[in-house]
Amino acid sequence: MNRYQETFKRLSCLKEGCFIPFVVLGDPSLETSIKIIETLIKSGADALEIGIPFSDPLADGPTVQKSNLRALSKNNTFFEYFKILKQLRKKNKKLPIGILIYANLVYNQGIDNFYFQCFNSGLDSVLIADVPIEESKIFYNIANKYKINPIFICPPDADADFLYKISLYAQGFIYVLSRPGVTGIKNNTIALPRDFINKIKKYNSVPLLQGFGISNPKQIKEAISSGLSGVICGSAIINIIEKYLNQEKKMIKEIKKFTHLLKLSTKLE
């Protein structure tokens, strides 16, 4: 079994959902970013989704866009990013670690070289946010060559044809969107209908995780009670980073408290 399979199996035995925080690597700096990630792990993260900074993150709302720009302003290199990811893996042998990236960055590295670097850094998965399933074959094939799980996004209004396609390609988990649009906290983030969740499960047994707008315990309890395996939370954590940009100790303290609260919410009673 790979790390995702082992993690989901362990959490299922514990009657817990999977909590995956998302942050952008290098925001607000590489040094602080490492402290944030270490805090997330110590405070209960079951896996990590780490964004590689990009200048035009189309799938992301204002909060994550600003996070990308803050990280890019430091002029860090791909070499530095992968060095940190490799260090994270050395310290966390069993933790699933995935990255979210945009296609231009993959092309700039060379597709094969990019996935080799992922493999060499001990990564488990790659989600290319702006590559639809229909255009994913070349990435999918090379990801498999290096034993990297390709992660795909499933919109809440997906039809049967799409669900069938995603069932053919999905590995690790499926990222099910709370709503169409971009990332961010909105008042209209609602629980996914149980019949929609059951429909996806008919096509694929890969765990389903809900993302986009997850920001409080109630949403997490609803997601897991409806049959999902867990949640991904990004903007709510990045809001804390932005709020305390000039108060690192306070930032870390608030992230620790928030992460602990959300992880507790994944436990089925």
Swiss-Prot record:
GO terms for molecular function: tryptophan synthase activity. PROSITE patterns: TRP_SYNTHASE_ALPHA. Pathway: Amino-acid biosynthesis; L-tryptophan biosynthesis; L-tryptophan from chorismate: step 5/5. One of its GO terms (cellular component) is cytosol. Keywords: Amino-acid biosynthesis, Aromatic amino acid biosynthesis, Lyase, Tryptophan biosynthesis. It is an enzyme of class 4 (lyase). InterPro entries: Aldolase_TIM (IPR013785), RibuloseP-bd_barrel (IPR011060), Trp_synthase_alpha_AS (IPR018204), Trp_synthase_suA (IPR002028). Its EC number is 4.2.1.20. Signal peptide: none annotated. It catalyses: (1S,2R)-1-C-(indol-3-yl)glycerol 3-phosphate + L-serine = D-glyceraldehyde 3-phosphate + L-tryptophan + H2O. The active site is at 49 (proton acceptor), 60 (proton acceptor). Tetramer of two alpha and two beta chains. The alpha subunit is responsible for the aldol cleavage of indoleglycerol phosphate to indole and glyceraldehyde 3-phosphate. Belongs to the TrpA family. This is Tryptophan synthase alpha chain. It comes from Buchnera aphidicola subsp. Acyrthosiphon pisum (strain APS) (Acyrthosiphon pisum symbiotic bacterium).
